Curated annotation (Swiss-Prot):
Transit peptide: 1-57
Keywords (A to Z) from UniProt: Calvin cycle, Carbon dioxide fixation, Chloroplast, Photorespiration, Photosynthesis, Plastid, Transit peptide
Entry keyword Lipid metabolism: no
Family from the record: Belongs to the RuBisCO small chain family.
Name used for this protein in its record: Ribulose bisphosphate carboxylase small subunit, chloroplastic 2
GO molecular function: ribulose-bisphosphate carboxylase activity
One term under GO cellular component: chloroplast
Location(s) in or outside the cell: Plastid, Chloroplast
Role description: RuBisCO catalyzes two reactions: the carboxylation of D-ribulose 1,5-bisphosphate, the primary event in carbon dioxide fixation, as well as the oxidative fragmentation of the pentose substrate. Both reactions occur simultaneously and in competition at the same active site. Although the small subunit is not catalytic it is essential for maximal activity.
CDD domains: RuBisCO_small (cd03527)
């Protein structure tokens, strides 16, 4: 029995010596700054300065009068048919499910059910038919947009990309606005 205890203690002692032999040297600090080149080119470019004071003069304020906000990038010009097609192809390429929604009264952001600021603004859009599960052709989605435009010419229509694995909406953009907006 004593032999058994001795041999296990000896095995532990030899195991620690092997571990200590393969240890990495401890951190000794940073190298001396004298080994790095000191000459620097003076940068006079205004965009590299930490302050944005020089850029303030070229900024413009978004005019809020008669400029309703629809979605995140609603300040951009309307998408052309080709741009819509490319957006839907991007949506499909990422494996998201295209859905169409429309709103007949308030296509822009407003507060109705909740008065706090933030993402939730009280809008509920009506879904056009069912989500297009299994859709692989962007032209099918645009054909549905055309059908929705014929049925509701005075409605806002948006396309949503829904990730059915993560259960989240990944993309949303306005595909059609009524005349005058």
């Amino acid at each position: 029995m004593a032999f058994l205890i001795m041999s296990s203690a000896a095995a532990v002692a030899t195991g620690t010596n092997a571990a200590q032999a393969s240890m990495i040297a401890p951190f000794t600090g940073l190298k001396s700054a004298t080994s790095f080149p000191v000459s620097r080119k003076q940068n006079l470019d205004i965009t590299s300065i930490a302050s944005n004071g020089g850029r303030v003069q070229c900024m413009q304020v978004w005019p809020p009068i008669n400029k309703k906000k629809y979605e995140t990038l609603s300040y951009l010009p309307d998408l052309s048919e080709e741009q819509l097609l490319r957006e839907v192809e991007y949506l499909l390429k990422n494996g998201w499910v295209p859905c169409l929604e429309f709103e007949t009264e308030h296509g822009f952001v407003y507060r109705e059910n909740n008065k706090s600021p933030g993402y939730y603004d009280g809008r509920y859009w009506t879904m056009w038919k069912l989500p297009m599960f299994g859709c692989t052709d962007a032209t099918q989605v645009l054909a549905e947009v055309e059908e929705a435009k014929k049925a509701y010419p005075q409605a806002w229509i948006r396309i949503i990309g829904f990730d059915n694995v993560r259960q989240v909406q990944c993309i949303s953009f306005i595909a059609y606005k009524p005349e005058g907006y």
